[in-house]
Amino acid sequence: LTAKLSYPIYDDLDIYTRLGGMVWRADAKNNVGGGDRSNHDTGVSPVFAGGVEYAWTPSIATRLEYQWINNIGDAGTVGTRPDNGMLSVGVSYRFGQDEAAPVVAPAPAPAPQVQTKHFTLKSDVLFNFNKSTLKPEGQQALDQLYTQLSNLDPKDGAVVVLGYTDRIGSDAYNQRLSQQRAQSVVDYLVSKGIPAGKITAQGQGESNPVTGSTCDNVKQRAALIDCLAPDRRVEIEVKGV
């Protein structure tokens, strides 16, 4: 019975030693005075061994070993007490050493899908014509909008308020008016509780009209104002909800 101690030299090559003991039984038969005499003895002797071992696979290895056993037998009993030395080459097989399956990292969780919600309010509901101050009806409309925004938890996203005018008036005037109207909506929603750092106002002037060429043949001013009403609007985009 021996204990094996190994030390790796390379990934697959080890040197090792074995230390322990061997229980032995020695039998002797001598011819004494014309007759045979048998004798035997038992005992324990130390075992020393050393070698190198190369692993071809996790299960199969080849080894070269020298083993020494000291004092086998008893000179007083069996007439001799030899030592035993042995050089051996062997192959070993380890059970249960199959290569482990590669560890597959779990797939990363999909990135949360960023959605953008759109709301459109008529400027004629929010403001008087050519004005940027909210009407009471406009405040009521924004109160309802704020309730919807709260349900979307806009604190986790960004809110962009886009102001649009119709094409009546100069480009510079319409740009300024659209910015003022968008800012009025932003200020009101901030007063309701939307963080100021999460909401911005952008005036778009008379760009992106929704009426197209519908009103091109309308000449009377009052009728043209009514026809272009859909272009006068405030759009609200809630991003990242």
From Swiss-Prot:
Disulfide bonds: 215-227
Residues the record marks as site: Part of salt bridge gating mechanism: 63
Recorded topology in the membrane: Multi-pass membrane protein
Known outcome of mutating residue 33 to V: In strain: ATCC 33430
Keywords carried by this UniProt record: Cell outer membrane, Disulfide bond, Ion transport, Membrane, Porin, Repeat, Transmembrane, Transmembrane beta strand, Transport
SUPFAM superfamilies from the UniProt entry: OMPA-like, OmpA-like
Localization terms from the record: Cell outer membrane
Name of the protein in its database record: Outer membrane protein A
InterPro entries: Bact_OuterMem_StrucFunc (IPR050330), OMP/PagP_b-brl (IPR011250), OMP_bac (IPR006664), OmpA (IPR002368), OmpA-like (IPR006665), OMPA-like_CS (IPR006690), OmpA-like_sf (IPR036737), OmpA-like_TM_dom (IPR000498)
Entry's free-text remark on domains: The extracellular loops are most variable in sequence, and in some bacteria confer sensitivity to phage and/or colicins.
GO CC terms in record: cell outer membrane; pore complex
Family to which this protein belongs: Belongs to the outer membrane OOP (TC 1.B.6) superfamily. OmpA family.
Entry annotated with the keyword Membrane: yes
Gene Ontology MF annotations: porin activity
Region 4 X 2 AA tandem repeats of A-P, residue ranges: 105-112
Keyword Transcription regulation: no
Lineage: Bacteria, Pseudomonadati, Pseudomonadota, Gammaproteobacteria, Enterobacterales
